[in-house]
Amino acid sequence: MSLFNDKVAKLLAGHEALLMRKNEPVEEGNGVITRYRYPVLTAAHTPVFWRYDLNEETNPFLMERIGMNATLNAGAIKWDGKYLMLVRVEGADRKSFFAVAESPNGIDNFRFWEYPVTLPEDVVPATNVYDMRLTAHEDGWIYGIFCAERHDDNAPIGDLSSATATAGIARTKDLKNWERLPDLKTKSQQRNVVLHPEFVDGKYALYTRPQDGFIDTGSGGGIGWALIDDITHAEVGEEKIIDKRYYHTIKEVKNGEGPHPIKTPQGWLHLAHGVRNCAAGLRYVLYMYMTSLDDPTRLIASPAGYFMAPVGEERIGDVSNVLFSNGWIADDDGKVFIYYASSDTRMHVATSTIERLVDYCLHTPQDGFSSSASVEILKNLIERNLRLMK
């Protein structure tokens, strides 16, 4: 075997060892979720044959030809008994694309499919696409709604940073062949749009996040709700805010729906992200809330504070101090797999159950919106516990 082939064999063996590494739970926790020791996907998990030209004649030094920078913000779905993430893969060139990775158990051994997703273009091509939410809708299609980013051509000459965000829509029956639908038409920019899994009053329902600019929400008040007559020509008319932003909370700057909600006997379980500003920049955390089965716009539970925040190495990455989730899977036995990205760099999994998540939502105190209210809530728990401890 030649030296070149030896190097290729070593690359492939190292990659296979990474993919086969067994993940293990981190036991210490808060009783709500279980974290796992290793990320489930990193840039190093992408196939060797995506990154290297394995032909000695055209790549005699075995150099990496196409660099991969990050794997993040993945949608998720259970498909043919496998746990699938539709991953945002970011190349070294900063362009993102979508690729499917599958696992037999949802915890480890995630492998990318051979090819990334070939996503048809809209009439107006996007420069970048990312953060797809997957919804298996009752109409029989699997929908993917994602952010389609384009340069803001109304920006001053020489401004190469200003951009616009719209919600791109695509659908599939097999996660391989995709039909591109027209982008969502709205009065404002949109970059966190999620399709509700069921019809509501015979219409498609969307969770939205209206915002004035590409980054800043401005007058956008929180997570919105809109009904759509025709998903193939989707347009938001009336839009109402169902989960508001509040001053001095974990969602004072902006918030956005994560994956589509999970239906439970007690209500719809929602996972969302909240953003606040601090000396280190924008801090992204995850939080939960519940809405009514009879009226998905009616809030029935809103626990105070964050559900998950970055810890340990999760704090470090391309965009530090960030957790983001747009994918989870609920198994028939009630186990829930929460897929989340840390610091725009890598993908992790945490597990819980429907029962625990509902208990967390219904029995965690709501935000009192002041220090004195927080103290009173804390005193109430202390008093009850002290009586039990006597």
Swiss-Prot record:
Molecular functions per Gene Ontology: hexosyltransferase activity
Catalytic activity reported: 4-O-beta-D-mannopyranosyl-D-glucopyranose + phosphate = alpha-D-mannose 1-phosphate + D-glucose
Designated name of the protein: 4-O-beta-D-mannosyl-D-glucose phosphorylase
A Pfam family annotated for this UniProt entry: Glyco_hydro_130
HAMAP family: Man_Glc_phosphorylase (MF_00928)
Keyword Transferase applies: yes
Free-text function comment from the UniProt entry: Converts 4-O-beta-D-mannopyranosyl-D-glucopyranose (Man-Glc) to mannose 1-phosphate (Man1P) and glucose. Involved in a mannan catabolic pathway which feeds into glycolysis.
pH-dependent activity: Optimum pH is 7.
Family under the similarity heading: Belongs to the glycosyl hydrolase 130 family.
InterPro entries registered for this protein in UniProt: Glyco_hydro_beta-prop_sf, Man_Glc_phosphorylase, Mannoside_phosphorylase
Temperature dependence: Optimum temperature is 50 degrees Celsius.
Enzyme Commission numbers on file: 2.4.1.281
Keywords of the record: Carbohydrate metabolism, Cell wall biogenesis/degradation, Glycosyltransferase, Transferase
GO biological process: carbohydrate metabolic process; cell wall organization
Protein origin, superkingdom: Bacteria
Coiled-coil boundaries: none
